[in-house]
Amino acid sequence: MAKESNIVHRYFKKKFDRATILVKVNPFIFKGMEITLPDEGEPEIRELTFDETIWEDLKMDGFEESSPLEFNLYYSGLAK
C-alpha cells in the first residue's frame, strides 16, 4: 500500500444557502476531512471515515470535484 504522504487525495465542494462544505478523501483508506465554511462565523473541521460508497454518496448529494488548493488554504487558515 502507498505511504500516506504519497496519496493523491480527491477533493469535493458543495455550496449551501448559508455555508460551503469542502471534503478531502483518501481514496485508498477512505479517511478524510470535512471543512464547513459558514457565511458568518468560524470554519469547523472534522476528521471522517468513509466507506466504498463515498463516491456515489457525494454525487447524489450534489458535491462536485474541486481544487486541492482551495481546501488546503482553508485548512491552513490562510483563507477565511
Positions of predicted regions on the chain:
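Short, compact, well-ordered microdomains
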Residues: 58-80
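Acidic, low-complexity, intrinsically disordered interaction modules
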Residues: 28-58
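N-terminal acidic leader/helix
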Residues: 4-34
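Short linear sequence motifs
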Residues: 4-5, 43, 48, 64-68
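Short linear motifs in intrinsically disordered/low-complexity regions
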Residues: 7-10, 18, 40, 52, ...
